[in-house]
Amino acid sequence: MKYNRIYINSNLAENSKLELARDYVHYVKTVLRLKIHDSLRIFNGSDGEFLAQITQIGKNNLSVVLKEQLKKAYIESALTLAVAIIKSDKLMLTINMATQLGITKIIPLITRRCQFRTVNIERLMKCVIEATEQSERLNPPIIEQAITLKDYLKKNNNLILYANEHEKVKHSILHISSLLSKDIAIIIGPEEGLLMMS
């Protein structure tokens, strides 16, 4: 049987009891419609994933016991997505898909052609957690504060992949496979493309 997953940013261990935060009470009771003795999966990136059984549900509290470890924590390859700040719905979709595909760090970029200069990091984190729960990952990507493209390029020493639609293809991604042992960063520009002066 496949159980619902919940990301918890707390220490997890077999046979331990865990009190879930108030935010989860509504979600577990009303959205998932779980009751006492029902099971769910609880996970985080540092301890892994555990099968948990609900032992108590109150108006504002919910307790579970972690029965058994289902997955051990693991280290993912470093894969950064530096994405221009675009319209909210499109940015959320990009963040969701990037999370499901295994991106480990997301950096919102401020470019000359950006329509927006700020981003709601808390909202992005909620999107990342939901996508992590759906995609069977253990580690949600880290979301950094927005930075200008110029500053990002100055401080970055990763291998950067960038598709320039105005240039003829010089190298296929298959030809650079020998470089893929390095940390990789992918840059996605705004809808109008990146200006090299950015």
Curated annotation (Swiss-Prot):
Gene Ontology BP, a term: rRNA base methylation
Q: What is its EC number?
A: 2.1.1.193
Record localization: Cytoplasm
Top EC class of this enzyme: transferase
UniProt keywords (A-Z) are: Cytoplasm, Methyltransferase, rRNA processing, S-adenosyl-L-methionine, Transferase
Q: Does the keyword 4Fe-4S apply?
A: no
Stored NCBIfam families: PRK11713.3-2, RsmE family RNA methyltransferase
For this protein, the record's PANTHER family field holds:
16S RRNA (URACIL(1498)-N(3))-METHYLTRANSFERASE, RIBOSOMAL RNA SMALL SUBUNIT METHYLTRANSFERASE E
* Annotated protein name in UniProt: Ribosomal RNA small subunit methyltransferase E
* Designated gene of the protein: rsmE
